[in-house]
Amino acid sequence: PGISNWVASSFTLSTASYTARWRGVNRPETGIVYIRGIYWLLMPEYKNRNALSANRPLPNYFWTANTEMRCLSRAIEQSLDHGYAHHIQRLMVIGNFALLTGLDVTEVCDWYLGVYVDAYEWVELPNTLGMALYADNAVIASKPYAASGKYIQKQGNHCQQCQYKPTKVTGPDACPFNSLYWRFIDQHLDRFGGNPRMGLVVANWRKRDPEERAVIVQWA
């Protein structure tokens, strides 16, 4: 009962935080209380969740940053060198890549916990497993934080110095995030088709020529 009340209070506080922001008051501590409440309510079972059946081994370059994808290389390199990275680097570059390629959930969570100096499991696990990897099936996030190369291009200048082009989907010089993104959508069409926040993306993919879709998925 105590834990249930804690989580219930967290939901109330989260709602209050949105109201406060509309009034010009920022209360980030309410989100922290919510995440901590989820952790204490759902652990230890939560740690084993893998809604998308992601099980590919963590690539070696997560420990060397030796990849030709510049945004990913720089994000990993900075993380290894400093034990820190910007939120966008953690979620929308490294986390996004792990999500799109179906990297093993436990291995990814352990990497985040071991690499970042500000990582405590009670806050790292829900953010990585739930938000970045969508492995908890919408407990934390109502949609997967999946994005193509065009989104990453808007977040920085790495694409200007990268051999891959964010405007291309297939081909040797195409940004891998693009084909991986559409393969991810194709792989989980049934799951995301009923999600209102994913409906437009799913509909656009289904409208594409079947041969074009097959080429993109194969390239990914």
For each predicted feature, which ranges?
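C-terminal catalytic domain of photolyase/cryptochrome flavoproteins
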Residues: 12-220
